[in-house]
């Protein structure tokens, strides 16, 4: 698919160091989780307010760390986190979900607004700090 082509092309760039990751938001977050079901050479998958596949056979194929970023006020997506966490744990697959207080769906974009509530900005800042820390540690 498109991400596989992009991944292969990016690996050939002069500045590439062999590390790659995938990140998506909302629908793209769900696609990031889906991509992780077949990816083998990624340093990680970073899912922002996206849902996981519900097929345990697909989840069982995940071989890369999946890092979830969720807003506490996003009931639709958050209703899926525990089932995902339980399935990934039972399958012994790497999944870490963090839920940020004061944030809803789309909090990374909404938290960038200078007029955003302080709690929303704090959630965005904490998620961004976590993302950059995880990327720096990626191998």
Describe each region flagged by the PLM:
Residues 1-23, 137-138:
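Gly/Ser-rich "nucleophile elbow"/oxyanion-hole loop immediately N-terminal to the catalytic nucleophile
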Residues 9, 34-38:
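Active-site signature of alpha/beta-hydrolase-fold catalytic machinery across serine-
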Residues 41-51:
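A conserved short beta-strand
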Residues 89, 94-139:
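C-terminal catalytic histidine-bearing segment of alpha/beta-hydrolase fold enzymes
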